Design a protein with these regions (language model features):
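NAD(P)H dinucleotide-binding glycine-rich loop of Rossmann-like/cofactor-binding domains
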Residues: 100-198, 202
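C-terminal hydrophobic helical "lid"/dimerization subdomain
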Residues: 1-2, 258, 281-285, 326-380
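Glycine-centered, small-residue-biased loops immediately flanking beta-strands
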Residues: 291-292, 317
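Rossmann-fold NAD(P)-binding glycine/threonine-rich loop
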Residues: 298-316, 334
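Adenosine-nucleotide cofactor-binding segment
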Residues: 198-204, 216-282
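Glycine-rich Rossmann-fold phosphate-binding loop(s) that bind the pyrophosphate
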Residues: 203-206, 298
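Glycine-rich beta-strand-centered segment in the early N-terminal region that forms part
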Residues: 26-42, 55-106, 110, 161-167
Length: 380
């Protein structure tokens, strides 16, 4: 058992507002298929915020819990059945999957039968409060990386000993396990975009930037980047965006018109990372016949997609859901690292580090849009 600090999420006083606090917790020794990880860094993803700002009972979610699912650290102890990691190995963390269901066996682990329950809910039994023996929901996405120590599932682990040059790279690569992987996979796996494609990307957080860089790698002929923060738009221009739209003063209901002012024929692929209902529906309308819209951003829980069925049928359009970019982390993460070394996936342009106890500042930077990917540092 280890004792360390963690960011504990408690039930919010009102929906949409997180209630996080820096607390001491006790972390159990690893089970047979688990690894005790000393965390070095963890990216903050919008999913961490969404799934700790909803009332208890939503989707089965309970409190208190520790979130965080873009972790990086070093293995301190391993269970007897663990084969992919040895004590002392640096590791990168991603989502959990069972490896035995139909989707896992078909190499689509992000659509694992147990994905929702194991990743979004986690489980009790591996972490408790230092005072009062309060059981804490942990193993969020198999990892709960907003903690100094965490007992993680082997399935969530990518061994990084042959992928990194030093510990600074381990920290830099922490966010590859979700946001960048999701955006990249939306282009690479979900849409299989190529040189003939015209791509619209709404929202330039880590997911959107991952999609943008991968669209450039895929040699898509036109890439339209949309955001409300000018600094992100300026950065997108340097990374391959051929057109940009700033929505800071725009009516979202006219986004389709703005896109068609640039490209009257519309786009072949629209990637929505915002989860804003009006943006989602305008993205769909921006696609031409047989175009694809990929939904990644999480909309309000009660939102129902508004599509005119007859028009949709005649257009041949497709609206696709996307979890983790339909990626296999043990393939996707090494690929993104190689792209980084090749200078075509420069994630260092997006990352800003914060001490773990300064998580409030990191959250503010994300909300303001001044930082694309805040990363919490657990070990300096």
């Amino acid at each position: 058992m280890e004792t360390g600090n963690a960011i504990v999420a408690r039930e919010p006083s009102q929906p949409g507002v997180v209630h996080w606090s820096f607390e001491q917790v006790e972390v159990a020794s690893p089970g047979d298929d688990e690894i005790l990880v000393e965390m070095y860094a963890a990216g903050i993803c919008h999913t961490d915020i969404v799934l700790s700002s909803v009332p208890a009972g939503t989707m089965g979610i309970d409190y208190p819990k520790v979130v965080g699912h873009e972790g990086a650290g070093v293995a301190k102890a391993v269970g007897k059945n663990v084969k992919s990691v040895a004590v002392g190995d640096p590791i990168l963390l991603s989502f959990y999957y069972c490896s035995t269901c139909q989707q896992c066996e078909a190499s689509h682990p992000s659509y694992c039968d147990s994905f929702n329950s194991k990743n979004y809910l986690g489980q009790q039994g591996t972490m408790k409060s230092k005072t009062g023996d309060e059981q804490i929901w942990a193993q969020f996405f198999g990892q709960s990386s907003f903690a100094q120590y965490s007992t993680v599932k082997e399935a969530s682990v990518v061994n990084a000993k042959d992928l990194i040059k030093d510990i600074s790279e381990l920290k830099l690569f922490a966010p590859l396990g979700c946001g960048f992987q999701t955006g990249s996979g939306a282009i690479l796996n979900i849409t299989q975009a190529g040189p003939k494609d015209v791509v619209l990307i709404t929202g330039l957080g880590a997911v959107g930037m991952g999609a943008l860089m991968t669209a450039k790698i895929a040699k898509c002929k036109t890439i339209i980047a949309v955001d409300r923060v000018q600094s992100r738009i300026d950065l997108a221009k340097t990374l391959g965006a051929t057109h940009t739209i700033n929505t800071s003063d725009a009516d979202f209901s006219t986004l389709d018109l703005a896109v068609r002012d640039l490209l009257p024929g519309g786009v072949s692929i629209a990637i929505d990372t915002t989860g804003v209902p009006a943006v989602i529906e305008q993205s769909i309308q921006s696609t031409h016949a047989r175009g694809k819209t990929v939904l990644i951003g999480v909309p309000p829980m009660d939102y129902m997609l508004n599509i005119h069925a007859t028009t949709h049928i005649s257009s041949g359009r497709a609206v696709l859901g996307c979890i983790e970019g339909d990626s296999d982390p043990r393939v996707a993460i090494p690929q993104m690292i190689q792209w980084y070394r090749d200078g075509i996936f420069p994630i260092d342009k997006f990352v800003e580090y914060f001490d773990a106890e300064d998580y409030s500042k990191a959250l503010d930077s994300l909300k303001e849009g001044s930082v694309v990917k805040p990363v919490l540092i657990w070990k300096k």
